Amino acid sequence: MPIYFEMLDNKSGNSSTQDRSDLLKKCITLLGNDRIDCIIGDREFIGKYFYKFLFNNDLDFFIRIKKNQILLVNGTELTVERLLGERKKCLLDNVGVSGFFLSIAVQRIKDKNGNPDFLMVLTNTFAHKALAMYRYRWSIEVFFQSIKGRGFNLEESHLRNIDKVKNLFAFVCIAFALCLSTGMEYHKKVQKIPVKNHTYKAKSFFRKGLDIIRDILRTDNQQSLYELDNWVWKLIRLVRVNLARYQYFIKIIG
């Protein structure tokens, strides 16, 4: 779940290099470089100026690039298709991209419609790490799918005021964390969530937790309501403790 976020006051929904740089500067101030393991971004997070910012701030990154990106390999300019050839996967270090020498991992995949596509991940570390690290971005996709259309329907709020949207988003983030932790606790201590033939769980941890909390709120079971209340307050106390710690950290370095 997000620990820091900003709302963009534009209609496109896309961020500029300046937007991304400003956001990361605030995160670095809040957390410190040593607590940021890496930056994982999709195809929007590209460009030599953004790469330069990441280099200057000593941040490792794993960023998906577009398939029309021109690569410089051993002095020769290549498209991704030419680089991959007939292979299913290719890992290369010391590849020229946007004026930098970086590492790249390329893999054949299928898009959401089942058509052939490429997954190309650029990194300033090593090519063999790129695909595995980029998979962590899937949890971000799951989070946004959950808050948009699988439970909270955030976009149906029709709020326009940026401050109100920001507050609502913060509360939804906390609610998501509560549902997720409830589902994980159920899976761990009550009953394992069954796995279907397609290897996915019958219900995600989030969905299971959301269903449990909904059922509790719809009943008059005082014991269940009491336990839910305690669970919520534990989460709130955890957030308060961490906020206090971060605020103290900011005062010390500021």
Which residues does each predicted region cover?
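Single, function-defining residue in the core of a domain
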Residues: M1-G254
